[in-house]
UniProtKB/Swiss-Prot annotation:
An annotated GO cellular component: chloroplast
GO molecular function: mRNA binding
PANTHER family per the UniProt record, alphabetical: NUCLEOLAR PROTEIN 8
Annotated protein name in UniProt: Organelle RRM domain-containing protein 6, chloroplastic
Organism: Arabidopsis thaliana (Mouse-ear cress)
Cellular location(s): Plastid, Chloroplast
Signal peptide: none
Keywords carried by this UniProt record: Chloroplast, mRNA processing, Plastid, RNA-binding, Transit peptide
Length: 181
């Protein structure tokens, strides 16, 4: 799908739910404050948004003649990376994982209080093949002195269906007796 951003036309992008995904700018912009008119293919937003240096005006027009890329919309292109060192930066992570393919989005989760990474990140590749190469190439490998784990990211619905943690039996309470001397 092509989108016109003022004077700039982005040839391939995806609209998923309330998010506008533009791989050329490696950014995701929420358009939840606007509305999507499917009949005319017009997305109108009430506010201006900055995506990779391009300011989206109050009206975005879409070209519905071209279809969105199916490879980037699948959940198998999103990876979960855990075990990251607190010293790992976004640049280090990007440089490490770009060798496996076109990395179109990266979210290193930060601890806002301590102002450092929490030790995990989410990555999105353009195709499933690139994501699988990244899993095979980096799962169990060292990055900044720590072993990292790379796997397909689970959706929230998968997490809610997961088997709950085993409940341990509560200790039986006995009446306490205190000795008085």
């Amino acid at each position: 799908m092509a989108i016109s951003l003022g004077r700039v036309v982005v040839p391939s992008c995806t609209i998923s739910g309330d998010r506008l995904f533009i791989p050329n700018f490696s950014a995701i912009c929420s358009v939840s404050c606007g509305r999507i008119n499917v009949g005319t293919g017009v997305i109108s937003a009430r506010r201006r948004r900055d995506i990779g240096g391009v300011l989206i005006s109050s009206c975005l027009s879409t070209d519905s003649s071209s279809s969105p890329p199916s490879s980037s919309s699948g959940p198998k292109t999103k990876l979960y990376v855990s075990g990251l060192s607190f010293r790992t930066t976004e640049d280090t992570l990007r440089d490490t994982f770009e060798q496996f393919g076109n990395l179109i989005h990266m979210n290193m989760v930060m601890d806002k209080v301590a102002n450092r990474p929490k030790g995990f990140a989410f990555l999105r590749y353009e195709t499933e093949e690139e994501a699988m190469k990244a899993i095979q190439g980096m799962h169990g490998k060292f990055l900044d002195g720590r072993v990292i784990f790379v796997e397909e990211a689970k959706t929230r619905s998968d997490m809610s269906r997961a088997k709950p943690r085993r409940d341990f039996p509560k200790p039986q309470s006995k009446p306490r007796t205190f000795r008085t001397w």
